[in-house]
């Protein structure tokens, strides 16, 4: 009888704990959604000139970083109009004879594949998100299969000064970074590029969220 009561009590505890965790996760998800909407509204209000001004300042600061200068294999996102513009960074990488890998989205997964030149960039097709990427059926060198990455430059919706990141909600970078850290012996530098307005005091996070090494803004 005692044993049966103990089993029943233990199951009740497990159920209650599971319910609490579900409520916590639902609260985090709701808070993230609200912050995404707020930040996207703020970034939308920035004019093109201000976005470009901040982008160039971030580019200048990036070029002075040892983590960037000493890296050979670099992952770089191809920016949208509401992100720090990465076109000058891309040109600089090719000028310095570094190797660049860009995101290619396949369903719910993202891989980093090699980009060969600015001419290669110009010929890339657009996705439904209006982002350039190589065709999913095209054979390209995969960064994690050919030596890994030294540096990953990361986009996002919001950040904190100590490296917390809020993405767009699809989990592409979260899953990729997790895979990258498992596959590589050497941990790559993780640097976010952001507008001043994207910095927050805090961001709701879960245990699976990975902290960045640096959030680079104009300031």
Language model features by range: what are they?
Residues 24-30, 45, 135-143, 147-152, ...:
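Surface-exposed, charge/polar-rich loops and edge strands
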Residues 26-148:
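N-terminal active-site beta-alpha-beta segment that forms phosphate/nucleotide-binding
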Residues 155-157:
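Active-site/ligand-binding-proximal alpha/beta "capping" segment
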Residues 169:
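Short polar/charged helix/loop
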């Amino acid at each position: 009888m005692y044993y049966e009561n103990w089993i029943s009590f233990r199951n009740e505890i497990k159920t209650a704990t599971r319910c609490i965790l579900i409520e916590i996760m639902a609260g985090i998800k709701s808070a993230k959604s609200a912050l995404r909407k707020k930040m996207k509204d703020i970034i939308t209000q920035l004019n093109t000139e201000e976005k470009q001004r901040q982008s160039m300042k971030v580019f200048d600061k990036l070029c002075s970083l040892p983590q960037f200068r000493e890296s050979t294999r670099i992952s770089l996102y191809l920016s949208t109009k509401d992100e720090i513009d990465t076109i000058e960074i891309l040109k600089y990488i090719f000028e310095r004879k570094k190797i660049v890998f860009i995101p290619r989205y396949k369903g719910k997964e993202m891989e980093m594949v090699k980009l060969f030149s600015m001419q290669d960039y110009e010929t890339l097709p657009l996705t439904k998100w209006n982002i350039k990427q190589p065709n999913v059926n095209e054979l390209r060198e995969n960064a994690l299969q050919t030596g890994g990455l030294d540096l990953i430059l990361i986009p996002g919706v919001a950040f904190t000064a100590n490296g917390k990141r809020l993405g767009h909600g699809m989990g592409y970078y979260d899953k990729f970074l997790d895979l990258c850290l498992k596959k590589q012996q050497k941990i790559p530098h993780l640097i976010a590029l952001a507008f001043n307005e994207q910095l927050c005091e805090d961001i709701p996070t879960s245990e699976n969220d990975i902290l960045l090494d640096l959030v680079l803004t104009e300031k």
